[in-house]
Amino acid sequence: MKRGKRYLENLKLYDKTQQYSSDEAMDIVLKTANAKFDETIDLAVRLGVDPRHADQQVRGTVILPHGTGKTVKVLVFAKGEKAKEAEAAGADYVGAEELVEKIQKENWFDYDVVIATPDMMGVVGRLGKLLGPKGLMPNPKSGTVTFEVEKAVKEAKAGKIEYRIDKAGIIHVPIGKKSFGKEKLLENFRTVMDAIIKSKPAAAKGQYIKSVVLSSTMGPGVKVNPARIFE
């Protein structure tokens, strides 16, 4: 794969074989995030679990103290008082069957989070094949199937993110933008890592955190020593 000149220049700024403390790694990531736009800072964590086993799944939600830097559009499936509550809380789209039809007919996905009240799941369930692959299907585990509509909308808007292990045993999450600066990004990073560590399945054997890599949208990956996540 051919790499651009900027990418190759960035590789000279650090030793890519070395594992750094999170503090040192963030310095390098910010130094190499030199594109002309506000790059997203991403985290990839490889875990010592086998995602093929139901008792070794790792997923959860966490509210980033400084948000993701992204404007989050929220769609809520609710009726009556709960629909009014969603609108008052700042939901971008609120509706019922008519929104299900819109999604089915128009392949409409102009939103980042979908919340539904439990009584709407019979209707929303018809969207499983459309919303599921995009990670948008409301789910009680992530707090998006709930009667506490106001709380769910406000948390989504505040930067609540869901993390889940993929088939390769890796969790990928964005932790903010370059413009946040080092301290805020480190706080977001450590908040996510703390949540992932606390999500360790009882069935997981051996080393749980195998590798931690920080990168910017256009920059190379920088390894964090799993023993120095909070340094």
Curated annotation (Swiss-Prot):
Swiss-Prot/TrEMBL keywords: Repressor, Ribonucleoprotein, Ribosomal protein, RNA-binding, rRNA-binding, Translation regulation, tRNA-binding
Superkingdom as given in the UniProt entry: Bacteria
Tagged with keyword Methyltransferase: no
CDD domains reported in the protein's UniProt record: Ribosomal_L1 (cd00403)
GO cellular component, one term: large ribosomal subunit
Cysteine-cysteine disulfides: none
Cited InterPro entries: Ribosom_uL1_bac-type, Ribosomal_uL1, Ribosomal_uL1-like, Ribosomal_uL1/biogenesis, Ribosomal_uL1_3-a/b-sand, Ribosomal_uL1_CS
Record Gene3D superfamilies: 3.30.190.20, 3.40.50.790
MF annotations from Gene Ontology: rRNA binding; structural constituent of ribosome; tRNA binding
Keyword Cytoplasm: no
Pfam families found in the cross-reference section: Ribosomal_L1
GO BP term, pick one: regulation of translation
Oligomer status and interactors: Part of the 50S ribosomal subunit.
Function comment: Binds directly to 23S rRNA. The L1 stalk is quite mobile in the ribosome, and is involved in E site tRNA release. Protein L1 is also a translational repressor protein, it controls the translation of the L11 operon by binding to its mRNA.
Family named by the database record: Belongs to the universal ribosomal protein uL1 family.
Protein name (Swiss-Prot/TrEMBL): Large ribosomal subunit protein uL1
Organism: Caldanaerobacter subterraneus subsp. tengcongensis (strain DSM 15242 / JCM 11007 / NBRC 100824 / MB4)
Gene: rplA
